[in-house]
Amino acid sequence: MLLKEIIREELEEDYYNYYNNLGEYSTGKGDDIKEITNNSQNKTNNNNNITILTSYNYNNNNNNNNNNNNNNNNNNNNNNNNNNNNNNNNNNNNNLFVSHSSILRSSSSPSSSESDEYSNGNNNNNSIINDLSSSSSSSSSSSSSSSSSITSPSSNHAYSPYNRSHKGIKISPNNKQVSSSGLLGSTMVSTSLIMGASNINNNNNNNNNNNNNNNNNNNNNNNNNNNNNNINIINNSNTNNNSSNSNNTINTFNFNNNLNNLNSINNNLNNYSNNMNINNQHNHQFNHYNNNNNNNNNNNNNNSDNNNIHFSNNGNMNIYNPNLSNFNNNNNNNNNNNNNNNNNNNNSNINNNNNNNKQIGNIVAKDDAEQLKESWKKIKEISNEFIKLSKLATKSDLQSIDLIPELRSKVMDLNNFLHVIEEKGELLKTDERQQKKRMESDKNAEKREKRREASRLLNNVCRNCKTTETPEWRKGPDGTKSLCNACGLHYAKNVKREAAGLHHLNEVGKKVDLTSILN
């Protein structure tokens, strides 16, 4: 125990000297650093005399988060607790841990034999536990909570387990206090903290989602070096929520947490058991790859239920993001519109096919009409040949006997053409073009008939030809409607010639001889 205390003091001094010499942040804005204490946010558990401060910083940047861990990852995390314990001391990213009296353990914490490496067995000491949850979005937070826990049995301050290369942690030279921030459900234990910035993000690409067995090993790596993140906390950059309209800003010096949220979380921490089994299993159902597939493939129309974001800490916190469901609803609407467009296109194709059928029908009708004309022409030719043959037969009785086979062949051809005309005639009865022609001819016939009836009612007679029926009565020498149509046109032409000087009229205005004009 004495050796452990000596090592602890040396490590504490080393930590303090290093972070004290670290100076300002990389931004060069040392004057803007604020030391903030959250004594009002402390929550005491009387059963263990352990002061626990929890603060949550919600970041809904959900596009490519490592939040798609299924319950299978939880089982893998339980199987990989030994690897996590080894990774706590031997991490490729040089994570420094100080482990002393009591360790804040999760529901899947290692056994007592395994925890002897990190704990001195003093679980009843008054201590302050700083649980920096390394994985806020993966389901392996149960193992990472124990791996990232730092206890100090005799001091009132906690040290950060972050990499030395990380410049987002500031230690006050006066109070020797280390501050750090966690994302999405990470618990923090401290009585006086500087709310410095720690570049903690678990927004891994979807490639990390497939590494189920390596999620525990990647948790601490994500705490220190997350190259896949575009969030620069040191520069006070904002992380915009791509799946909602809210602007989730991660500030370097200020947390975006309301006291009401902290109080509700502290109330939830009262329900923890005496063994300090904290269940930080976050069932993050972030199926954003399904959202991307909805953008690329219009066939995924049933992913709207998977877009509810559930942040669960012992099943007491549920956050619903409605914009994701709206996003998928829009995709579904787009898909429906695409389907409607396809239906419209199909309907247009059907209409085009119908038009083509109509055109084909017109072509067939036209061919039938032409075939009828050809057949009638052939019949006319055959009839002319009959006349010729009959003339030859009348000249010589002997030759008529030789013409009988030729006449029979012509009769057979005539019968064939007659059958064709009968068949095509039935088809032409349903042809619209032929019906229109018949209707027009019928209308013209009706007009002509009406004119004839009108002329009969007048009882008029042409003065030249003595006809009583004419399509139109014309002006003559005896006045209007004195000549028929043909006589009236001839009379008008002669009058124009007389006016031109061919036949000069008398100046007295004698009547012109009707016979001379008409002739």
UniProtKB/Swiss-Prot annotation:
UniProt keyword Cytoplasm, yes or no: no
CDD domains, alphabetized: ZnF_GATA
Any Pfam family hit: GATA
Coiled coil: 429-461
GO biological process: regulation of transcription by RNA polymerase II
Keyword line: Coiled coil, Metal-binding, Zinc, Zinc-finger
PROSITE patterns (alphabetical): GATA_ZN_FINGER_1, GATA_ZN_FINGER_2
Zn-finger segments (GATA-type): 462-487
Compositionally biased region (Low complexity): 37-156, 273-357
Annotated spans, Disordered: 25-182, 198-249, 273-359, 431-453
Cellular component, GO, one term: nucleus
GO function term, MF aspect, one: transcription cis-regulatory region binding
Bias (Polar residues) ranges: 172-182
Transmembrane segments: none
Protein's name according to its UniProt entry: GATA zinc finger domain-containing protein 8
Provenance organism: Dictyostelium discoideum
Taxonomic classification: Eukaryota, Amoebozoa, Evosea, Eumycetozoa, Dictyostelia
